[in-house]
Amino acid sequence: MQRIAKKAGTLTLSLDLFDEVDLMMESSNEGRTWFIKESRLVHRHAEIGRSYEILVQASALAALIARNTVDEASRAAVADLLRIALAAFGTADRADIVYFKSLYRFVRAEGYPLKEQWFPTLPAADRTSAAELLNRPLSTQTALPAVVTRLRRRLEEYLRGHTEILID
């Protein structure tokens, strides 16, 4: 067995699932296939792995965004949203609330008028709960998980029936 020497001063960067990176890409066949030429780690969200529930919710949000084509005009807003959401997943105890708030913000960033169309369809008690979830900081949230789940499901049902956003 022969050891392959590395160039002096080069380090191999192992990228992780939720890492934010700067990439230099290159194509050898007129843009049909792209390869990573260089990568630079910007931020690692390692804390997301501290809990299975957090990992599941963060993965669901990332998959939702990946599944839906983001208009060029809203890409910066969605990138900021993802950055904020991943940081929140890393520090918050309530991943369900982070996901719900992030889903709502994503749909709003895509231009859908949730406040005007979805919100009024909720029963009064759910409107109050939704407003508290969306407007209060995570650290002050006290909503029961069942309430968050119910509101998330109602929002997802609305999105399936009234938008082009792919939930599943």
Language model: regions and residue ranges:
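Non-catalytic alpha-helical scaffolds and adjoining flexible linkers that form interface surfaces
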Residues: M1-D168
